[in-house]
Amino acid sequence: LQIMFSSTNKPNAKSLSIKLQLPLAIFQRKEVDILETISRAFHNEKSIREYSIGKYRIDLYFPKYKLAVECDENNHQNYEILNERLRELYIQEQLKCTFLRFNPDDPEFNIGEPISKIFSHIVNYHSQL
């Protein structure tokens, strides 16, 4: 249980581990670190981590800009491609949103790229007002 609570990114895991009096070691995942960096870069903008839509969750969602951000660690190798595409289409249909995906495990990954794309999306939104 300790490993499960320590490695999850579910918001209630920490409080539950405290109630169960389990020592909690923090093992941050790459996804968590990167999404926190992105959230800090846009701290003046409302963003929601693990945003739920139907049976799905979005890693990071900017509701004002209808922008879904997905961190695809290892290109989501454990996910079936068709199911992942259907998930994305469902979310886009429900939220009328744009998807931004990036893979932090790509050797060419640079945190500046998703931050720049989010910034461009926000600027584009404001220019159309």
Regions found by a protein language model. Name each.
Residues 1-129:
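Nucleic-acid endo/exonuclease domains
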